Amino acid sequence: ADIENGEDIFTANAS
């Protein structure tokens, strides 16, 4: 799941 998919956007930002 990548940010491009729009599903892990929040997770990526939280990381």
Swiss-Prot record:
<dbReference type="GO" id="GO:0009543">
    <property type="term" value="C:chloroplast thylakoid lumen"/>
</dbReference>
<dbReference type="GO" id="GO:0015979">
    <property type="term" value="P:photosynthesis"/>
</dbReference>
<keyword id="KW-0934">Plastid</keyword>
<comment type="function">
    <text>Functions as an electron carrier between membrane-bound cytochrome b6-f and photosystem I in oxygenic photosynthesis.</text>
</comment>
<comment type="similarity">
    <text>Belongs to the cytochrome c family. PetJ subfamily.</text>
</comment>
<protein>
    <recommendedName>
        <fullName>Cytochrome c6</fullName>
    </recommendedName>
</protein>
<keyword id="KW-0793">Thylakoid</keyword>
<keyword id="KW-0249">Electron transport</keyword>
<keyword id="KW-0150">Chloroplast</keyword>
<keyword id="KW-0602">Photosynthesis</keyword>
<keyword id="KW-0813">Transport</keyword>
<comment type="subunit">
    <text>Monomer.</text>
</comment>
